[in-house]
Amino acid sequence: MLIRKAEVRRQTRETEIRVQLQVDGTGEYALDTGVPFLEHMLALTAKFSGFDLQIRARGDLDVDDHHTVEDVGICLGEALVKALGDKAGIGRFGHAIVPMDDALALVAVDLSGRGYLAFDVPMPSPQVGRFDTELVEEFLRALAYNGRFNLHVRLLAGANTHHIIEAVFKGLGVALGSAARINAQRGVPSTKGVIN
């Protein structure tokens, strides 16, 4: 079986990023972004998707975390597109409803070739530690649009902001892992015969 993996590099005046992704992995990760909370969330996504993920990012953190977080999302999305190739045999759809103590998040994906984000996750607090919680939506938007997939995220319950975000990123991992999984009985999962 072909190993589905990709590497993406991005360099701007604001960030320098390298992402290595192996879809058919074991959930191993090595993350160095300068944004500890983002690393914590990406570790959850890697573990629950089964993707192997290595990310090294340097950004203008003296300004804020925005550019680094968004550009990591861009690169991870691009890596997913490259790793999945023509998407032959994938499940295409994946979803999860994930509890984390008080929080309950629904995450659904369609690896359709079309980027879209529907995000209905009220954040009780504007920050978790030093991390601006509005960056969760920015990251997911960059990931979905550059990964060319539909992503729906909805909070069903929750009061603790850390728990809410953790449920979202665990759900993202479960949903992406399911959608990307190969079913040997299938060709390209589209009546059009292609996904792009």
Curated annotation (Swiss-Prot):
- Keywords assigned by UniProt? Amino-acid biosynthesis, Cytoplasm, Histidine biosynthesis, Lyase
Entry GO terms, CC: cytoplasm
> Which Pfam families does the UniProt record give?
IGPD (PF00475)
Which pathway does this polypeptide act in?
Amino-acid biosynthesis; L-histidine biosynthesis; L-histidine from 5-phospho-alpha-D-ribose 1-diphosphate: step 6/9
State which Enzyme Commission number(s) the record gives.
4.2.1.19
Write down the SUPFAM superfamilies for this protein, in alphabetical order.
Ribosomal protein S5 domain 2-like (SSF54211)
Give the location in the cell.
Answer: Cytoplasm
Give the source's domain of life in one word: Bacteria
Similarity field = Belongs to the imidazoleglycerol-phosphate dehydratase family.
What name is this protein filed under?
Answer: Imidazoleglycerol-phosphate dehydratase
Organism of origin is: Desulforudis audaxviator (strain MP104C)
